[in-house]
């Protein structure tokens, strides 16, 4: 499907590839007004037994990004991975996507009344340039937390029956029907959706992969050299 550019603060200067089939990540990039290509890669690794959640999301994002970069070497590749961390008695567990409706119900039941962390790791692979043979990439991550409310089992069961939880980390969608499950959010909303936009945009601007639109009618742009970035 051909993308139509919408009114935007930014415009891309090089081809951009999103290495994800996630509708949430696609929607977030589209909201920026950028045109990009989606390359879905079947390269998501499983967590290792002794691997910290942060190490895992960074590794998973890097694996996805490098797989897409092999297919699109002249593009900026954006890849990400998100996990929900269930913590009890100082022991953490990585909660991925449910395998069944029963699995979804079990996850949501465990979350009730608790505060849990969401981690999104990202990897950007920059386009190969002449006389540069090594891959240039950048890793970053962001965390947020969510406080679940207390809900009756029949409500959770009804939510699971909608099918919305099927492909969501933690078995809920904060952007959809499942928003009612959450009492409190701490941190950036886009991190929970799977793509931390503030950190991503700053890096794309710094490497001049996108520019700021100064005059939306003429698409005149201002160089990112004139902008100040927070580290």
UniProtKB/Swiss-Prot annotation:
Active-site residue numbers: 81 (proton acceptor)
Keywords carried by this UniProt record: Cytoplasm, Hydrolase, Nucleotide metabolism
CDD domains: Maf (cd00555)
A GO molecular function held by the record: dTTP diphosphatase activity
Required co-factors: a divalent metal cation
EC number(s) on file: 3.6.1.9
Annotated localization: Cytoplasm
GO cellular component: cytoplasm
GO biological process: nucleotide metabolic process
Site residues, Important for substrate specificity: 24, 82, 175
Family (UniProt): Belongs to the Maf family. YhdE subfamily.
Name listed for the protein in its UniProt record: dTTP/UTP pyrophosphatase
Organism this protein belongs to: Lawsonia intracellularis (strain PHE/MN1-00)
